[in-house]
């Protein structure tokens, strides 16, 4: 069972590694850029983005569960559907955290790295959404 769950966990972790490396490179090569000057606009944008992506994920998951292709039947038969559902579930959690980071940016809390954390989560969630769309396309198309 572990071999069937771990691919989903890896798919969730890999974008965070990519975003962390990009953050370190960004900080090294462009050290003067700061996103904390316009926290209210950033918070509103990220909260709106998170809410929209949650709606898209609900639609994608509904489409995936309702799809009746041979490829998806094999994935269910071999037990790998658990990994797919784990990726969707962790993406929902990630977008929920991003939504609340956006709300914290709208509040008067300052002194924390909330803008940096929120942009990192948003970047990783965008990569996750791209992976899920690619996965949805591959799982639901008919084989030629």
Curated annotation (Swiss-Prot):
<protein>
    <recommendedName>
        <fullName>Protein rexB</fullName>
    </recommendedName>
</protein>
<feature type="topological domain" description="Periplasmic">
    <location>
        <begin position="105"/>
        <end position="115"/>
    </location>
</feature>
<dbReference type="InterPro" id="IPR031892">
    <property type="entry name" value="RexB"/>
</dbReference>
<keyword id="KW-1043">Host membrane</keyword>
<feature type="topological domain" description="Cytoplasmic">
    <location>
        <begin position="135"/>
        <end position="144"/>
    </location>
</feature>
<dbReference type="GO" id="GO:0016020">
    <property type="term" value="C:membrane"/>
</dbReference>
<feature type="transmembrane region" description="Helical">
    <location>
        <begin position="8"/>
        <end position="26"/>
    </location>
</feature>
<feature type="transmembrane region" description="Helical">
    <location>
        <begin position="86"/>
        <end position="104"/>
    </location>
</feature>
<dbReference type="GO" id="GO:0033644">
    <property type="term" value="C:host cell membrane"/>
</dbReference>
<keyword id="KW-0472">Membrane</keyword>
<keyword id="KW-0812">Transmembrane</keyword>
<dbReference type="Pfam" id="PF15968">
    <property type="entry name" value="RexB"/>
</dbReference>
<feature type="topological domain" description="Cytoplasmic">
    <location>
        <begin position="66"/>
        <end position="85"/>
    </location>
</feature>
<feature type="transmembrane region" description="Helical">
    <location>
        <begin position="47"/>
        <end position="65"/>
    </location>
</feature>
<feature type="transmembrane region" description="Helical">
    <location>
        <begin position="116"/>
        <end position="134"/>
    </location>
</feature>
<comment type="function">
    <text>May participate in viral genome replication by preventing the degradation of lambda-O protein (protein playing a role in DNA replication). May also prevent host cell death under conditions of nutrient starvation.</text>
</comment>
<keyword id="KW-1133">Transmembrane helix</keyword>
<feature type="topological domain" description="Cytoplasmic">
    <location>
        <begin position="1"/>
        <end position="7"/>
    </location>
</feature>
<feature type="topological domain" description="Periplasmic">
    <location>
        <begin position="27"/>
        <end position="46"/>
    </location>
</feature>
